[in-house]
């Protein structure tokens, strides 16, 4: 069975680069009816935090990237790592090394001074040193000294490294803790991982890991090293570019569907198709069409996709996110129009759910603030009389007539005729009175969504506060 994994370290938050790796791994497993597993690589006890673990899990949950088994934690597997280390030592594939820090520092200085390749020189490789109580020692892996380490990378093609370029790496530190390159191999063997999809910053680790797989007589998985994501300026993606906790995108009003759609196309293609549902991603995704070159993060493209999903999604698919932002903004959705009706009207005017909430607040909150510039421009000495006439005309409408935007628009137009002024002399002041600003959807739709009670009370307030009468 095809089995992939995502293995973040909880030393920082989950950012878009990690999310894309997780997405590619998840999609490949789903495409092949396989399994997707999640492993938390938390062996760096000094830098790993529970807050970072929680952020990773929150991000994966928000995006809908569900793992198929219980989460693996490396800190719960130390006994297993030590078991395998003892096995390698017993088989002559690893050895104890008691070289002092001073000796290793001198070795490195000598190598650098003579333009030699830096690395351990194998002094303890064939020695018969056995640690005694109180000794300071490490355990090193006996890397092959001849030949090549080669693999057919699913993204980068054939890669070969001479074993002469690799030294005998440490697999257990002086404090007894196992090292990263060793742990991940044991984990991937035990988890039966068949395909490792990860960032290409791991390419240099791969030959070391392949040699450990072979030493353990284990099947070597397929590797797919995905190029990094660059900022819009071509520099390494940083916080100023968008390399922030993925949950910040939620706070900024992006939909998970938009994030996933954007990231799947960031370095992977399927013809000219830009819009992908989750099901379409699963059906189409493969490793062959991952681009071997880095991709640049494009905020405008992400906003365009987010706008698309706000406009085109079934409301039930985005309801949770919309309600989240309204609650965060302190708006009571029971005190206004149905959210589905609101989104249908406002979607064309916004790129994010934060914008949607901010631009829609007057529908749900009576605490509107008048835009001074709009008031100064559109509210005149005769506006009070117009507002009074509007009140009369709106009060005369039956309840069901408030459900028809055209009827409400016609009331505004007929009021303009009655007052012998142009439509703009009525519509703009009315818009300011009921929304606080000179911008809103079509006046008939705005009136319908607000409803009779709100419109009348806000007109009465405007007469008192804006018209001094």
UniProtKB/Swiss-Prot annotation:
Motif ('KMSKS' region): 236-240
Gene Ontology biological-process annotations: glutamyl-tRNA aminoacylation
Gene Ontology annotations for the cellular component aspect, listed alphabetically: cytosol
Cofactor(s) annotated in UniProt: Zn(2+)
Catalyzed reactions per annotation: tRNA(Glu) + L-glutamate + ATP = L-glutamyl-tRNA(Glu) + AMP + diphosphate
GO MF: ATP binding; glutamate-tRNA ligase activity; tRNA binding; zinc ion binding
Enzyme class: ligase
Binding locations of ATP: 239
Keyword annotations of the record: Aminoacyl-tRNA synthetase, ATP-binding, Cytoplasm, Ligase, Metal-binding, Nucleotide-binding, Protein biosynthesis, Zinc
InterPro entries: aa-tRNA-synth_I_cd-bd, aa-tRNA-synth_I_codon-bd_sub2, aa-tRNA-synth_I_CS, aa_tRNA-synth_I_cd-bd_sf, Glu-tRNA-ligase_bac/mito, Glu/Gln-tRNA-synth, Glu/Gln-tRNA-synth_Ib_cat-dom, GluQ/Sye
Entry's EC annotation: 6.1.1.17
Pfam families per the UniProt record, alphabetical: Anticodon_2 (PF19269), tRNA-synt_1c (PF00749)
PROSITE patterns, per database record: AA_TRNA_LIGASE_I
Co-factor binding details: Binds 1 zinc ion per subunit.
Compartments, record wording: Cytoplasm
Subunit structure: Monomer.
Name of this chain's protein: Glutamate--tRNA ligase
Organism the protein comes from: Francisella philomiragia subsp. philomiragia (strain ATCC 25017 / CCUG 19701 / FSC 153 / O#319-036)
């Amino acid at each position: 069975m095809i089995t992939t994994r995502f293995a973040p370290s909880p030393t920082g938050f989950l950012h878009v680069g990690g999310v894309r790796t997780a997405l590619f791994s998840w999609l490949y497993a789903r495409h092949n009816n396989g399994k997707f597993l999640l492993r938390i690589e938390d062996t760096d006890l000094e830098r790993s935090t529970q807050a970072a673990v929680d952020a990773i899990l929150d991000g994966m949950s928000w995006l809908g990237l569900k793992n198929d088994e219980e989460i693996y934690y490396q800190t719960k597997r130390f006994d297993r790592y030590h078991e395998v280390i003892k096995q390698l030592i017993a088989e002559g594939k690893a050895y104890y090394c008691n070289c002092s820090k001073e000796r290793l520092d001198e070795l490195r200085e000598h190598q650098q001074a003579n333009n030699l390749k830096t690395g351990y020189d194998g002094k303890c490789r064939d020695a018969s040193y056995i640690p005694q109580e109180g000794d300071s020692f490490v355990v090193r892996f006996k890397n092959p000294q001849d030949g090549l380490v080669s693999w057919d990378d699913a993204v980068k093609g054939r890669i070969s490294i001479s074993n002469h370029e690799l030294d005998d790496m440490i697999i257990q530190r002086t404090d007894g803790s196992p090292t990263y390159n060793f742990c991940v191999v044991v984990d991937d063997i035990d988890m039966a991982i068949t395909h490792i999809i990860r960032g290409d910053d791991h390419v240099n680790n791969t030959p070391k890991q392949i040699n450990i797989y072979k030493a353990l007589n284990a099947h070597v998985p397929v590797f797919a090293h995905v190029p990094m994501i660059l900022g819009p300026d071509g520099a390494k993606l940083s916080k100023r570019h968008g390399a922030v906790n993925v949950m910040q995108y939620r706070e900024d009003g992006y939909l998970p569907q938009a994030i996933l759609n954007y990231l799947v196309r960031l370095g992977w293609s399927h013809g000219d198709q830009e819009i992908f549902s989750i099901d379409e991603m699963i059906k189409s995704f493969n490793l062959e069409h991952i681009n071997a070159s880095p991709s640049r993060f494009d905020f405008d493209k992400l906003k365009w996709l987010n706008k698309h999903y706000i406009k085109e999604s079934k409301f039930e698919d985005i309801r949770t996110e919309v309600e989240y932002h309204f609650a965060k903004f302190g708006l009571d959705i029971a005190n206004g129009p149905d959210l589905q009706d609101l989104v249908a009207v406002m979607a064309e005017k916004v790129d994010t759910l934060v914008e949607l909430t901010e631009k829609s607040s007057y529908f749900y909150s009576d605490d509107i603030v008048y835009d001074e510039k709009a008031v100064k421009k559109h509210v005149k000495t005769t506006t009070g009389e117009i507002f009074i006439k509007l009140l009369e005309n709106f009060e005369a409408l039956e309840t069901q007539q408030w459900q028809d935007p055209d009827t409400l628009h016609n009331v505004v137009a007929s009021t303009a005729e009655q007052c012998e002024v142009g439509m703009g002399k009525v519509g703009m002041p009315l818009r300011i009175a009921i929304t606080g600003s000179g911008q809103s959807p079509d006046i008939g739709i705005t009136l319908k969504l607000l409803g009779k009670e709100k419109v009348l009370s806000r007109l009465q307030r405007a007469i008192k506060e804006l018209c001094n009468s």
